[in-house]
Swiss-Prot record:
Family stated for the protein in its record: Belongs to the RNA polymerase beta chain family.
Binding partners and assembly: The RNAP catalytic core consists of 2 alpha, 1 beta, 1 beta' and 1 omega subunit. When a sigma factor is associated with the core the holoenzyme is formed, which can initiate transcription.
InterPro entries: DNA-dir_RNA_pol_bsu_ext_1_sf, DNA-dir_RNA_pol_bsu_external_1, DNA-dir_RNA_pol_su2, DNA-dir_RNAP_su2_dom, DNA-dir_RNAP_su2_hyb_sf, RNA_pol_bsu_bac, RNA_pol_bsu_CS, RNA_pol_bsu_protrusion
EC number(s) stated in the UniProt entry for this protein: 2.7.7.6
Gene label: rpoB
Reactions the enzyme catalyzes: RNA(n) + a ribonucleoside 5'-triphosphate = RNA(n+1) + diphosphate
Domain of life where this protein originates: Bacteria
Protein known as: DNA-directed RNA polymerase subunit beta
One GO cellular component term noted in the UniProt record for this chain: DNA-directed RNA polymerase complex
């Protein structure tokens, strides 16, 4: 196995037993692929596929005018270039988008000619607004904030059969129904009522008999019956009836007469019930007809009209019940043949026939009118209107679309073989659905399971954006149609016809405010990746929280390998928001697929197939952990398998597929929990969710016990810097890495240099800090996709959300009661859980009615001390340490002329002071905040003069850009001259640059020449001269290209910013706030074991072992048994072993042992105790030393989900580290030095600090705002509110009889307006008395009673 740059430096000991058949796929593929399909950027006109934007345009165009004399056709589209790159968009608060230009063709037909001759054609490109672009990490930048569009899991279009589970009717009878759901258009429902008639509803309106719909489709009663029933044929001869016999239909009936064979032998006696045995005998005897008495047909229903053979008079209508009167007429008229419907109570009910009987319509027109009345009640129906409405409902491509998915699901469900077809319904479709529904009612076939993942599909970003875009286009279409009639006469161009505003508005609305367009969760790399892989059942066209029942939220067998059964939020959204499983992907129809290995005759192959939930149903699927021999043959007698969505066991020969990996069941977050298989599901759910809330610590620390997925998450999340091409590190500093690309990876015409600017101390969406640190050194070789710099919460290319803490499970003085956590002061001293939070504070200078606001250091009534951190422009310096109330940006606002007091007039006359007509509206640091200014950005409107600060910021940015471009040029130039040197040395010169003819060129000669003179050399060989010319042209070209790039960036920086109307200037100040861990902060492990820090004890008081090593954290052992998350104990044991081995390696290095000894010990760790073998022999001695140095803090272990370390392996590891195999040790009390009475479990657990910090929650109100109606203080930190003294608290004071305190609480401290104002005044005067008055809430009560019409007044004495 090849190791990457970072893997070589620190190898994880992997305990997995199963080989990797397939790597975990790229985790953001679902987002990126979907949007790439939507845009089809870079495709030429012929390459466009019928998806995304192209499909939306094709579905709306061509637009034809009402008269039909003009048409607007769509030719193609192209996307422009974005005005700013992603970082600039975030900084400036704009949307990262590209302009969309559509080429349309206007065709005007000649009115006079009969065969629509073309009179004029105009083609033009029309601007259709901006389309947001997806960043390479699967996010969108909308108005400067990063957002994610969450995929939606919705009911697939198609046809579904269901029943009401006996809830509708009191008898508990199952009422079956069918529903045709299109991708867009009207829903069509068929349903049975308790009397077994079939009804139809369109768009959930009033129901009509289903036969009305069939008649509207043009079927006659006879055709309907013919489609749904078979017939019994009776021949009538001389008062006797003869039935053409189909033996199987007699089953269950009672014989009216003896049934005899040809020889007269009785097969069934009269009065006996006919059984399957009798039917066999009848068929054997070959009886073709059966004589029955006339009354045998009484009560049966006619299948065809019965006509008098002589006169043509209708004796009985079709679908009429035969009675004695009709029979008498038939016998009299000597009718020869009667056809009746074959129905019975077992498997062929008379449902459609009964429905026809209650149907009041008799022909197509009446049926159409009836449907029109139901859809448009109150409007007078006409024949044309009724026909148009009906045709538009299901048969018009503009109004109705099943989509490819819908057609495929529809055809499969009704048993057709082809999967493609029209997007609209046809007659046959509707009849087929009714037939299937009647079959299900008759007991043939089963209803669908709506929660089966074969009936729910995923709508990704691209598809939702396409739908929104189409909505915009349809709005445009209406306007264009009206203008097209003008275009015929007035010679307009396409540009004059199309108004792109509705399209732009629809797209903007979707990305800005759709329920599924969410503010990205950017706490840490895991939360980013999980957010992008989320699948929600909520949103437009989906479910709502209130209506979603238990079934929809539950785990379904088809979730296996597609949707994670663990990761879902706790609370009202449980089960509605899910996460994709690690290996899942969507197919072309949007159904989730999971990968499997193909198994043939018990031999497991390496062929991998992706199957959707429907496709896998018939397969027999073994688990990934099924036992195989060396030849990959399944060897167990019985294998645990999944078949037909059930878990069962089968023989190896029956197995057809096998899981690719044990972790394919769970999502990315759940697959990061070691020993997940030992945790209770509820706690695992909490563990998955809490990892997403971990705040990136100051120094990331890799987990000692991981699962091996950490590297994938860090790489795919996009927070690390990954090498685009392999090469050598040319230079590296804290803020950028320059790579000289290897020659074999440079394509012609490209620069052989990659420059990576690192993100330094940037604010994330959640105010945490994004900072990248380089891992490479100058001169290192890197390969493509190696990790060169760590981001937040990553350590050497691995996800590192928390810190490894030495913990002990023991009760300790009640400090860890109820999940509290007791910490050692050492944790704070070493800054283990110190986090940096970055706050953005904005100051906006507007143009007001009274004049413009001004940003300045000249602020009225403010002392010098308050201004000493501001520069002359009135903006705080970068690096200043500021606290609550300090001025960050000085700003003054003009205030209206006020009446001056005589004193002020006098002062003005003496000092000529004008400062009083402006008021101080400076940006100050909010309460409870203390930090360092790390950055300032100034945005100025076009036409407003820029201040000195803005100019200095611009100069710094230009210097950075110039430095980058110069560096790039230096490397390109250096590489070119190196290539020339190797080509020229040893060849003869013809002259030039002061050389003699025939002189050999050496390195010394070239070193003596300036670079510019190399090109003056004339060589003896023409090929070399040509190479020199090409090199010179290339270098000049490159220089010009880089200069153009610089000018372009300069132009962008110097142009004014596009600010909101009325805004002159915006100053953004970024504060970095350092937060150490403190009591009240929430911490957690990865197993759902969460708690709040209760106390931070001095190191010397903490329990310590015999060597004097104190523990860092004391946890309560009672938190484990009832919660059943035993994974944390195993993690603690393995963590202890990992740390012990690291210490052992450290001792070997300090004792300067031989490399061979180190190599032997590493071999013991990696290759002798279970799990995967590592190829340490391929490492050089230096690499072994580097590896050992990085292992001194502990040997990282990986115990993959469901394939992790066994108990015996943990014990072997502890033994190798010279630690007790029990994982327990004797501890001593730090305060007394006494032994604790029994050994304690001590080890290393990975702990996270969650983004629920006490600093963000704690606040105290002094004076603040009041609620308008009740005049009581507001609640909550955001409103600077007070603590509610509620009903129960009042009871408590009443119980103590604390009358004065109670009065104070309910009046002056709450809503007695006059009382509290007076009291404030008294306190200022030093008089500490209060006079309670009438609380405002009492007045509110009086007003409410009056609103009920009761006059109530307070009597004053």
């Amino acid at each position: 196995m090849a190791y990457s740059y970072t893997e070589k430096k620190r190898i994880r000991k992997d305990f997995s037993k199963l080989p990797d058949v397939m790597d975990v796929p790229y985790l953001l593929a679902i987002q990126l692929d979907s949007y790439r399909e939507f845009l089809q950027a870079g495709a030429t006109k012929d390459q466009f596929r019928d998806v995304g934007l192209h499909a939306a345009f094709k579905s709306v165009f061509p637009i034809i005018s009402y008269s039909g004399n003009a048409a607007l056709e769509y030719v193609g589209y192209r996307l422009g270039e974005p005005a700013f790159d992603v970082k600039e968009c975030v900084l400036r608060g704009v949307t990262y988008a590209v302009p969309l230009r559509v080429k349309v063709r206007l065709i005007i037909f000649d009115k006079e000619s009969s065969n629509k001759a073309i009179k004029d054609i105009k083609e033009q490109e029309v601007y259709m607004g901006e389309i947001p672009l997806m960043t390479e990490n699967g996010t969108f930048v909308i108005n400067g904030t990063e957002r994610v569009i969450v995929s939606q899991l919705h009911r697939s279009p198609g046809v579904f059969f269901d029943h009401d589970r006996g809830k509708t009717h009191s008898s508990g009878k199952l009422l079956y129904s069918a529903r045709i759901i299109p991708y867009r258009g009207s829903w069509l429902d068929f349903e049975f009522d308790p009397k077994d008639c079939v009804f139809v509803r369109i768009d959930r309106r009033r129901k009509l008999p289903a036969s009305v719909l069939l008649r509207a489709l043009g079927y006659t009663t006879e055709q309907v019956l013919d489609a749904f029933y078979t017939t019994n044929v009776f021949s009538l001869k001389d008062e006797t009836l003869s039935l053409e016999l189909i033996a199987s239909r007699l089953r269950g009936e009672i014989a009216v007469l003896d049934i005899q064979d040809e020889k007269g032998k009785v097969i069934v006696e009269a009065g006996r019930r006919i059984t399957a045995r009798h039917i066999n005998q009848i068929e054997k005897a070959g009886i073709k007809s059966l004589d029955v008495p006339l009354d045998y047909v009484l009560g049966r229903t006619t299948a065809k009209v019965i006509v008098h053979p002589a006169t043509g008079e209708i004796l009985a209508e079709c679908n009429t019940e035969l009675n004695t009167e009709i029979l008498a007429k038939i016998a009299k008229a000597q009718v020869v043949r009667i056809e009746t419907l074959y129905t019975n109570d077992i498997d062929c009910g008379p449902f459609i026939s009964d429905t026809l009987k209650i149907d009041s319509t008799s022909n197509q027109l009446e049926a159409l009118v009836e449907i029109y009345r139901m859809m448009r009640p109150g409007e007078p129906p006409t024949k044309d209107a009724a026909e148009t409405l009906f045709n538009n409902l299901f048969f018009s491509p503009e109004r109705y679309d099943l989509s490819a998915v819908g057609r495929m699901k529809f055809n499969r469900r009704i048993g057709r073989t082809e999967i493609e077809g029209s997007g609209v319904l046809c007659k046959e479709d509707i009849v087929a659905v009714l037939k299937t529904l009647v079959d299900i009612r008759n007991g043939k076939g089963i209803v669908d399971d709506i929660d089966h993942l074969g009936n729910r599909r995923v709508r990704c970003v691209g598809e939702m954006a396409e739908n929104q875009f189409r909505v915009g286009l349809v709005r445009v279409e209406r306007a264009v149609k009206e203008r097209l009639s003008m275009a015929e006469s007035e010679g307009l161009m396409p540009q004059d016809l199309i108004n792109a505003k509705p399209v732009a508005a629809a797209v903007k609305e979707f990305f800005g405010s759709s329920q599924l367009s969410q503010f990205m969760d950017q706490n840490n790399p895991l939360s980013e990746i999980t957010h992008k892989r989320r699948v929600s059942a909520l949103g437009p066209g989906g479910l709502t929280r209130e209506r979603a029942g238990f079934e929809v939220r539950d785990v379904h067998p088809t979730h296996y390998g597609r949707v994670c059964p663990i990761e879902t939020p706790e609370g009202p959204n449980i089960g509605l928001i899910n996460s994709l499983a690690a290996y899942a992907r969507t197919n072309q129809y949007g159904f989730l697929e999971s990968p499997y290995r193909v198994v043939k005759d018990a031999l497991v192959t390496d062929e991998i197939v992706f199957l959707s939930a429907i496709e896998e149903a018939d397969h027999v699927i073994a688990q990934a952990s099924a036992t195989m021999n060396d030849k990959k043959v399944l060897i167990d007698e019985l294998v645990a398998v999944r078949h037909l969505n059930e878990f069962t066991v089968k023989a190896p020969e029956d197995v057809t597929l096998m899981d690719v990996s044990p972790k394919q069941v769970v999502s990315v977050a759940a697959s990061l929990i070691p020993f997940l298989e030992h945790d209770d599901a509820n706690r695992a759910l909490m563990g998955s969710n809490m990892q997403r809330q971990a705040v990136p610590t100051l120094r990331a620390d890799k987990p000692l016990v991981g699962t091996g997925m950490e590297r994938n998450v860090a790489r795919d999340s996009g927070v690390c810097v990954v090498a685009r091409r392999g090469g050598v590190i040319d230079s590296v500093d804290a803020s950028r890495i320059v790579v000289r690309v290897a020659d074999d990876e440079v394509e012609t015409g490209e620069a052989g240099v990659d420059i990576y600017n690192l993100t330094k101390y940037t604010r994330s969406n959640q105010n945490t800090c994004i900072n990248q640190r380089p891992l490479v050194r100058k001169g290192d070789r890197v390969q493509r996709s190696d990790i060169m710099a760590d981001g937040p919460s990553t350590d050497m290319g691995e996800l590192a959300l928390g810190q490894n803490m030495r913990i002990a499970f023991m009760a300790w003085n009640g400090f860890n009661f109820e999940d509290s956590i007791c910490l050692s002061e050492r944790v704070v001293q070493e800054d283990r859980f110190t986090t940096i939070h970055i706050q953005e504070l904005t100051c906006v200078a507007r143009d007001t009615k009274l004049g413009p606001e001004e940003i300045t250091a000249d602020i009225p009534n403010v002392g010098e001390a308050a201004l000493n951190k501001l520069d002359e422009a009135g903006i705080v310096y970068v690096g200043a340490e500021v606290g609550a109330g300090d001025i960050l940006v000085g700003k003054v606002t003009p205030k209206g002329e006020t009446q001056l007091t005589p004193e002020e007039k006098l002062l003005r006359a003496i000092f000529g002071e004008k400062a009083s007509d402006v008021k101080d509206t400076s940006l100050r640091v909010p309460t409870g905040t203390k930090g360092t200014v790390i950055d300032v950005q100034v945005f100025t409107r076009d036409g407003v003069e820029r201040d000195a600060r803005a100019l200095s910021i611009e100069k710094t940015q230009l210097d950075e850009i110039r430095k980058d471009l110069n560096e790039e040029f230096r490397i390109v130039e250096g590489a070119t001259f190196e290539r020339l040197r190797s080509a020229l040395v040893g060849h003869k010169a013809e002259g030039g640059a002061g050389l003699k003819k025939g002189q050999d060129i050496t390195d010394e000669i070239l070193d003596g020449l300036e670079h510019g003179q190399w090109f003056k050399l004339r060589m003896a060989e023409d090929a070399l001269n040509e190479q020199l010319e090409k090199a010179q042209a290339y270098i000049v070209d490159r220089r010009r290209l880089l200069d153009d790039k610089f000018e372009d960036k300069k132009r962008k920086l110097q142009q004014g910013d596009d600010l909101a109307p009325g805004v002159l200037k915006i100053v953004k100040v970024y504060l970095a706030i350092r937060r150490r861990i403190q009591p009240g902060d929430k911490m957690a492990g990865r197993h759902g074991n969460k708690g709040v820090v209760s106390v931070i004890m001095p190191v010397e008081d903490m329990p310590h072992d015999a060597n004097g090593t104190p523990v860092d954290v004391v946890l309560n052992p009672l938190g484990v048994p009832s919660r059943m998350n035993v994974g944390q104990i195993l993690e603690t044991h393995l963590g202890l072993a990992a740390k012990g081995l690291g210490e052992k390696i450290n001792r070997m290095i300090e004792e300067q042992r031989k490399v061979a000894d180190l190599r032997k010990f590493l071999h013991e760790i990696y290759n002798e105790i279970g799990g995967r073998k590592e190829e340490l022999d391929t490492f050089s001695d230096q690499e072994i030393l580097d590896l050992a140095k990085n292992l001194r803090g502990g040997v990282p272990m990986a115990t993959p989900v469901f394939d992790g370390a066994k108990e015996s392996e943990i014990k072997a590891m502890l033994k190798l580290a010279d630690l007790p195999e029990s994982g327990q040790m004797q501890l001593f009390d730090g305060r007394t030095g006494n032994k604790f009475e029994r050994p304690v479990t001590v080890g290393y657990m990975y702990m996270l600090k969650l983004n629920h910090l006490v600093d963000d929650k704690m606040h105290a109100r002094s004076t603040g705002s009041y609620s308008l109606v009740t005049q009581q203080p507001l609640g909550g930190k955001a409103q600077f509110g007070g603590q509610r003294f509620g009903e129960m608290e009042v009871w408590a004071l009443e119980a103590y009889g604390a009358a004065y305190t109670l009065q104070e609480m309910l009046t002056v401290k709450s809503d007695d307006v006059n009382g509290r104002t007076k009291m404030y005044k008294n306190i200022v005067d030093g008089d500490h008395r209060m006079e309670p008055g009438m609380p405002e809430s009492f007045n509110v009560l009086i007003k409410e009673i009056r609103s009920l019409g009761i006059d109530i007044d307070l009597e004053t004495e």
